Amino acid sequence: MLHALRQAKAQATATVAARVGIGGPVGSGKTALIEALIPVLQRRGVDFAVVTNDLVTKEDAERLRRSGLIDPDRVSAVEAGACPHTVIREDPTLNIAAGDELEARFPGVELILFESGGDNLASTFSLDLVDWWIFVIDVAGGDDIPRKRGPGLLRCDLLVVNKIDLAPHVGVDLDRMLADARQVRGGKPVIATNLKAGTGVEAVADAISAAVLFRI
Amino acid sequence: MLPLLRAIWQADAAFPSGAFAFSYGIEGALALRPDMSLGEFERLCAAVLQQRWASYDRIALQRAFRAGRDLDALAAVDREIEASTMIEALRAGSRRNGASFLAAHARLGQPLALKLRAQVKAGDCLGHIAVMQGAIWAALQLDEQHAALCSAYTVASGLITAAVRLGAVGALQGQSVLQALLPLIDALVATPLDDDAELESFIPILDIAAARHVHAELRLFAN
Ligand SMILES: Nc1nc2c(ncn2[C@@H]2O[C@H](COP(=O)(O)OP(=O)(O)O)[C@@H](O)[C@H]2O)c(=O)[nH]1
Ligand SMILES: [Mg+2]
């Protein structure tokens, strides 16, 4: 009896994919992070799919589909009705439905990444939609960004500070920016990345695996 | 008062149902006529209510409302919508909005929503928004007339919100249009509906705009 129950529970959980959000300002590197994560997740044998929330048509979805990195059918696009905030927070139902639809089409899927259309530092993901979420900022936005304490930056489960290669070119003191970020986040994780070179991508994949896939 | 309160709950734009992402063809129409005046915009909204909502969505909504929990009857109305909506963008938009609406009610644990979601998943039902609203609102014990008001009101307020977000009308200009549309909604809902009324919808500018919208390079709304 107990065994049957456990089995039923295992089956029920096996059909439900972990849902991870990737938010942050436009141009910070959200799509680049997904592009960098794809081969790492594939190498680790993770069965995953992606939902993009483009502000304008299906730009990001098409970019991922054409990348040749992932089966194009595993990328779904949700148009955000000019409201990138709303579609991940006040009304996440389009995204929830897109995730359900991917789960139905790919029964083994364990992880679904949701890329936000991107807007300002105030954007956060509804916990109805995702189990865990990443916020991506970049150094070119300025080293005072952490001190502005936007809800996105404070509340996310993982903060990614991207484009560290650009720090010397934009006059940003990277160590100080990272220290400020860790301080305002009360010690919650911060990872520095250079997605052009792949720096930090394994660490982001480790964080996702540990948080929602329960693999270390 | 409870049935009325339930209708207000469902008509509230704060209820997450995906509706905000659909422009009912307005985005395409504004692209065709970027200099549309407020008066023309109001007439276009009235045309949507009269020529699409009243003769199409409302009929599907009422049939679904009366079908209640009869899944076969609901699937039949659903297939009729699919067959009689000529424009692919509107057909796909209606299905996606229906899926979001169902996702919301399924998450809230509504038993019929869970069943319908399984049907859509299995391909036994397509899940058009008007049919899902009719079925779920009956299950939530809204009054039939309130359900019709709720449906027409959400279409009207959706048109206006879309136009405001596209920058075509101001937030208060939009509300003046919505206020002017209320008597029309009232009159449309008060008109009795024949049991054998056929689904009909034809608004040339919106149909053409929606058809062109599919190919638009730059668009914010799903339809
Ligand atoms: N130098 C540098 N450029 C990057 C890095 N990551 C992303 N970019 C570039 O930044 C731009 C925006 O990236 P994208 O992923 O589209 O941003 P999104 O809007 O957040 O999805 C693109 O031109 C990327 O090539 C990085 O680590 N270093
Ligand atoms: Mg992007």
From Swiss-Prot, chain A:
Pfam families: cobW (PF02492). GO terms for molecular function: GTP binding; GTPase activity; nickel cation binding. Gene3D superfamilies: P-loop containing nucleotide triphosphate hydrolases (3.40.50.300). PANTHER family: UREASE ACCESSORY PROTEIN G. Facilitates the functional incorporation of the urease nickel metallocenter. This process requires GTP hydrolysis, probably effectuated by UreG. Belongs to the SIMIBI class G3E GTPase family. UreG subfamily. This is Urease accessory protein UreG 1. It comes from Bradyrhizobium sp. (strain BTAi1 / ATCC BAA-1182).
